[in-house]
Amino acid sequence: MSHQKGLDTILRSDKTVFSFREILILWGETNAKLAKAKINYYVKTGQLYPLRKGIYAKDKNYEKLEFAGKIFKPSYISLETVLALEGLISHQNKNISLVTYQTRHFLCDKQNYEFKKIKNSVLTNSLGIIQKNNYVIASKERALLDTLYLYKDYHFDNLNSIDWEKCFDMSYIYKNKNLEKRLYTTYESFKYN
């Protein structure tokens, strides 16, 4: 594959961020050394933007949520990012929050990415998880449950849009009595306010 054809394949994609493995698949390339050389050429000539080892963007205007989901896999966007996007909290933490298999903080292009550890049985369960615009994100109900599971005391501003039945139906995947209590307390508090 010529240099220009390889770049054109990337530029035609609806994705803005690519892992090295995704580029290999996109190009149908089996020679990793050759692919790495092409990618390095694109980076040196400013045609690809390096984000992190093995992760590249078309340019500096990449989708940050898409990048977030490629840093650690498996992971999904949740917690305060989803709560703020859905209007459940008014204070938005400027971090992009995800859950994954380890707790980490990462900074790239002046954007903080915060990863919170959650047990594998929850992380790999697809209930309330949505594939959206080249990234994976929790529904507002799943984000509420993740937050109640990970944080002992958390203040929510507006729970009017929550489907409580979905929350109670999904809560079993956490297998956690403290979460069950926090969910019930949060529901009771909302119901009587």
Predicted regions and their residues:
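Short beta-edge/loop segments at beta->alpha junctions of small alpha/beta modules
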Residues: M1-P74
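Nucleic-acid-binding surface
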Residues: D59-N193
